[in-house]
Amino acid sequence: MKAEDIKKITVIGAGDMGHGIAEVALLAGYRVAMQDIEQRFVERGLGRIKESLDKLVEKQKVTDENRKAMLGNIETFLDIGEAVKDADFAIEAVPEIMDLKKKVFEQLDAAAPKHAILASNTSNMSVTEIALTTKRPDQVVGMHFFNPAVMMKLVEVIKGEKTSEETMQTTYDLALKMNKVPVRVEKDSIGFVYNRVNAPTQIYLSLLVERGMVTPEEIDARMRKIGMPMGPYELMDYVGLDVAYYGGQYFAERISRDYEPSDWLKKKIDAGELGKKTGKGIFDWSKGRPEIDLSKSKEDFDPAVLIAIQANEATKLLEEGVVTSAEEIDKAMASGGGSGIGTFQMARGIGFEKLAGICEDLAREFGVKVFEPTETLRKGNI
């Protein structure tokens, strides 16, 4: 099957990611089915789509006629079988719980047409493991959108061990038709590209707070002052502290115990303070986006530390064959974050030797093996 053959897309899950992906499909001209387990979830997701389309009409990005046509192109369901029975492409967007994803894919495989491609929007988890629950592992692929799906350009297209080249190419071409920037992930590796490169910075940011070395506002103010649209702690809140927590647990199980979530983050989770989605997390979101006091900027904090950690992890992706080139990593990082600049592009401006030295110092100071510089970073021939 080619991308041109796709007429109807089913999205499983109507939450933040699910309804966003459904809207992306509508904007690209597809018929869409959106499913969730309770009517209230479906109605809330559909309501969010309507609100978003209304805003696009106000901004004159779509016409009112187009808005009505798109709303006429979406159906909602509670039953997975009904939602996917005539789909050409299905995208799962349920919470990051492996057992839940496996259950969903068993149901999709049983009910979807034989030609249909089954994609997971997982941000971290093994596509290969998910695919093993189906009788069509060659037609199972990772298709990782970023939040908010309508605005963010990056889509990671992840190859499981048995994913066919036809499935990869069709999914890549579908992302292009959705006006996204797809990046091929050639090896099913935990965290893929964007989240894998950023994951070690979560260790560092957590350690700074855990040890009382900084406050989140001091770092965010510093990063905002140098031009970042959002500081790293505010971004954690925006995505959801639960996502960071469970992602950390998964990385700890699959890659290194260094990723084990810190006590301060666990306390936030236990208190139900998950960030924007609950109105409170690291910051207070009850009145909208938190105000960051730029006068509290920690001026002696060197942003090169974060770049060093990211560049070091990015070299591991090259060494492991997760992607084919440094350019693909830079495309992912530039499109997924909002800075518009790739990790290696920034690293070259600072110097690989300096960054390797920073990583050595961090590994020694914090006792974190993940921070140890790779041979690729030391040599700098990237």
Residue ranges and their predicted role:
Residues 1-382:
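N-terminal glycine-rich phosphate-binding loop for ADP-containing cofactors
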